[in-house]
Design a protein with these regions (language model features):
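Transmembrane alpha-helical segments of polytopic membrane transport and secretion proteins
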Residues: 1-40, 286-296
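Transmembrane-helix boundary motif in ABC transporter permease subunits
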Residues: 93-125, 138, 146, 286-292
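Amphipathic cytosolic juxtamembrane alpha-helices at the membrane-cytosol interface
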Residues: 113-117, 122, 180, 184-212
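Generic hydrophobic transmembrane alpha-helix motif, especially the helices
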Residues: 126-164
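Interhelical loop and adjacent transmembrane-helix boundary motif
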Residues: 72-73, 228-276
Length: 296
């Protein structure tokens, strides 16, 4: 009997060792594959960043920010009008898109909750989040540009705002949902009106998360080109008239990069570097703001 028990114990131990060996082998294979996949993705990301930096740094100068885009096959010049135009488009898109996104997010998190209207809004919002920017551009072209019979800065603002609003809605709703219901109940117990509770408690508690969403939304629209081709188009001259086509960095980069002129191509690479650095800084700032609130 003792011999049988010893043999059984030895067999179980051997089976356990084999099972553990198989698990370790599977773990090594999975770890190796995941590391290889990560390295593959990082390689292309680093390669793109290095190519952008090495090609764009040569075109960086003070003239880039002070001079207008040059005529074809002309030395010198800069991207001042394109930078100013992009700044105006992003500014106005944020001014219009952010309040709409925040108010819609407040409705979904505080008022609508599981109502049919809230579900419809969430469904439409999910569609807009995943919609290609060129589809948004064509939509705005149809309802704005075609009706006005000319391109304009305001058409570009509307298109960019339509891309920005869904991100702000989703972020605002999610951040408000993270606020404990006990805080809401405590405010109601003190006789606080709902609007005041939202303004003084839930919004205040989630302001850093909402700011993070706004910054990410700005980063999202900063480099959009396709929709601006159908709305704001571009302008070779300095113009702040939003009723007319307005210069912007993404379309200028597209036009210059596709040209046969070396001077324009150099300016295009410099513009790409500017957009890359701006988006990188916005993402870093968003993470810092969110981390500060999380650990604070």
């Amino acid at each position: 009997m003792a011999m049988v028990e010893m043999q059984t114990t030895a067999a179980l131990a051997e089976s356990r060792r084999k099972m553990q060996a198989r698990r370790r082998l599977k773990n090594r294979i999975a770890l190796t594959l995941s590391m290889a996949t990560m390295a593959f993705g990082l390689f292309w990301l680093i390669w793109i960043l290095m190519s952008t930096i090495t090609r764009g740094i040569d075109g960086m100068s003070l003239a880039l920010f002070t001079e207008m885009t040059p005529p074809p096959n002309t030395e010198g010049g800069g991207l001042a009008n394109a930078l100013a135009g992009s700044g105006l488009l992003i500014l106005w898109a944020t001014v219009f898109g952010t309040p709409l996104g925040i108010m819609a997010g407040i409705y979904l998190a505080e008022y609508g909750r599981k109502s049919w209207l809230a579900e419809v809004i969430r469904f439409i919002n999910d569609i807009l989040l995943s919609a290609p920017s060129i589809v948004v551009g064509l939509f705005v072209y149809t309802i704005v540009v075609a009706q006005m019979e000319h391109f304009s800065g305001w058409a570009g603002v509307i298109a960019l705002a339509l891309l920005q609003v869904p991100i702000v809605i989703r972020t605002t709703e999610n951040m408000l949902k993270l606020v404990p219901d006990s805080l809401r109940e405590a405010a109601y117990a003190l006789g606080t009106p709902k609007w005041k509770m939202i303004a003084a408690i839930t919004l205040k508690a989630s302001v850093s998360g909402i700011m993070t969403g706004i910054l990410l939304a700005i980063a999202r629209i900063a480099g959009e080109t396709a929709l601006l081709l159908f709305t704001a188009l571009s302008n070779q001259f300095w113009s702040t008239d939003m009723m007319q086509p307005i210069a912007n960095l993404p379309v200028t980069i597209f036009k210059f990069a596709m040209s046969p002129f070396a001077e324009w191509q150099q300016l295009a690479w410099a513009g790409v570097l500017i957009i890359t650095l701006c988006v990188l800084l916005l993402n870093i700032l968003a993470r810092v703001v969110f981390a500060k609130n999380k650990h604070g």
